[in-house]
Amino acid sequence: MPEHEPTDSQQSSDTVLMMIEAAARSGSWNMATDEYLLEAALSGGLKAVRMYRWEQPTVSLGYFQDSDDEALSTTFQKLAAVRRLSGGGAILHHHELTYSFVIPADDPLTQLPTELYGRVHKAIIDVLRDFGADCS
């Protein structure tokens, strides 16, 4: 896995762990790993970006989404399903690269969402380029 050093504008405390999982995993594995990373961010200050894939078509439901919704049941009845820690609606995962990121709740970047997402997306683009992808 390529290593990425902090940019000049970042301090050493802003180092972010980049995790790229080669093997596709089950939805329950992916959500459990995301939960573990979130707990590590909250309790130990971890900053991480994780890139991963799904081993089978899986629908992930948002944290507050009603899993008994009849439209969801009909549409996704034959698929594996998991619940995300984040909100939002149902997402069908298959043949994709998914990412998650965690930072401590008291990190100043939590108050600057545009800059936070910009940094995360730049890090992902840098990693993809390291692997030969043509992206911007």
Q: What is the meaning of each model-derived region?
A:
Residues 69-109:
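A glycine-rich, hydrophobic loop/mini-helix early in the fold
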Residues 98-136:
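Contiguous, small/hydrophobic- and glycine-enriched helical/loop subdomains that border
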Residues 48, 78-80, 89-90, 112-113, ...:
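Short, surface-exposed, polar/charged, turn-prone segments marking secondary-structure boundaries
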Residues 33, 95, 120:
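Catalytic-loop motifs flanking and including active-site residues across diverse enzymes
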Residues 1-2, 78:
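Generic secretory/membrane-interface signal
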Residues 2-72, 83-84, 134:
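Active-site loop/lid in soluble adenylation, ligation, and acyl-transfer enzymes
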Residues 51, 76-77, 121:
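Hydrophobic alpha-helical segments and their boundary regions
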